[in-house]
């Protein structure tokens, strides 16, 4: 549970009381602070015991590139840290980007710039404070059924071959001939407590009809469409009214090596799609960049944005797919049919039938 109100960025006294009472309030003292702030310097104990010392160097290395940020002008600095998901956002994206991790589970991290209207808070999503931009937020969606569900479909309907799977996806039309398929081999998080497979005829978009199955060759496209449409519909729900939609999609995880899936993401979300150039250590690099930000601002009188700091750094992502407008329009038209089908699945789960 977060002890902080993510909108005001202040501790919530009622939650502190339940968690640890006045003793906890006394320990945490001041309100949370924004990343990029220097809180002080390391205690002399760390110098005596572990060799922390005046001067030194901060560096970040990844494969063939090494950036040296220069000597420190004071003792080792103490700066706010963050978690692995916000750190990945720092390492890979800019405000207005979306990171989609397609691994064993599926996770979306959506950077939301500051707005006079806050994003919607849903029970199916998480809202985090952005570590480097005051007033900015990160929306997070987490799904249990990710690559393992796709692999099950591959094994059953594509001869356990990704090449065959991709071929079947590319041979079938966007919209899958007015059919939607949902695959939840494990109890899902979004929508909650749903398990099983569900197939719908959506030729009448307002009245989906439950089907027993669909043609074998339709399943590879069906699972991609339902998984990504679930995310697409929720982005539309979360963003504040009048907010600009994200403009870049950055895909990570094992499926980021599959060009067919990368193109699929570009088409469903209507965004240029990128993959990371820094491998699997994005969270660690993001944490180091946050520390660098505190040091950099200190050298600049406390001024400057994170984007200004990294403006001369090597690119962290590369373009791999661009949306096809005619395909994107198909998926825009599937948002409401998707919602109708998911509503029926939720009703099915709530009645236990």
Can you name each region flagged by the protein language model?
Residues 3-22, 38, 43-252, 257-353:
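Active-site core segments that coordinate phosphate-bearing ligands/cofactors
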Residues 26-33, 92:
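Acidic catalytic cores of enzymes that act on phosphate-bearing nucleotides/polynucleotides
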């Amino acid at each position: 549970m977060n002890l902080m109100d993510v909108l005001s960025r202040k501790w919530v006294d009622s939650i502190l009381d339940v968690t640890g009472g006045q003793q906890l309030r006394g320990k945490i003292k001041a309100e949370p602070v924004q990343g990029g702030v220097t809180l002080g310097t390391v205690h002399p104990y760390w110098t005596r015991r572990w060799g922390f010392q005046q001067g030194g160097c901060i560096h970040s290395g990844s494969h063939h590139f090494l950036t040296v940020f220069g000597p420190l002008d004071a003792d080792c600095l103490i700066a706010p840290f963050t978690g692995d998901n916000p750190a990945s956002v720092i390492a890979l994206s800019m405000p207005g980007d979306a990171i989609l991790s397609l691994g064993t589970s599926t996770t979306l991290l959506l950077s939301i710039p500051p707005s006079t209207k806050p994003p919607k808070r849903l029970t199916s999503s998480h809202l985090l404070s952005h570590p480097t931009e005051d007033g900015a937020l990160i929306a997070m969606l987490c799904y249990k059924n990710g690559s393992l569900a796709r692999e099950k479909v591959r094994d059953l309907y594509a001869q356990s071959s990704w090449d065959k799977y991709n071929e079947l996806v590319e041979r079938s039309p966007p919209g899958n001939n007015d059919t939607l398929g949902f695959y939840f081999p494990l109890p899902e998080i979004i929508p909650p407590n749903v398990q099983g497979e569900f197939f719908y005829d959506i030729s009448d978009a307002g009245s989906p009809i439950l089907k027993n199955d669909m043609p074998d060759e339709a399943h590879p496209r069906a699972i991609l469409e339902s998984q990504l449409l679930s995310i697409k519909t929720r982005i539309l729900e979360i963003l504040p009214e009048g907010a600009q939609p994200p403009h870049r999609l950055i895909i990570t995880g094992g499926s980021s090596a599959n060009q067919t899936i990368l193109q699929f993401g570009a088409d469903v979300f209507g965004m240029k799609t990128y993959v990371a150039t820094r491998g699997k250590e994005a969270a660690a690099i993001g944490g180091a960049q946050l520390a660098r930000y505190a040091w950099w601002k200190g050298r600049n009188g406390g001024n400057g944005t994170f984007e200004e700091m990294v403006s001369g750094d090597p690119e962290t992502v590369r373009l791999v797919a661009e949306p096809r407008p005619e395909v994107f329009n198909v998926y825009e038209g599937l948002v409401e049919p998707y919602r109708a089908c998911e509503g029926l699945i939720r009703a099915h789960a709530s009645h236990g039938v």
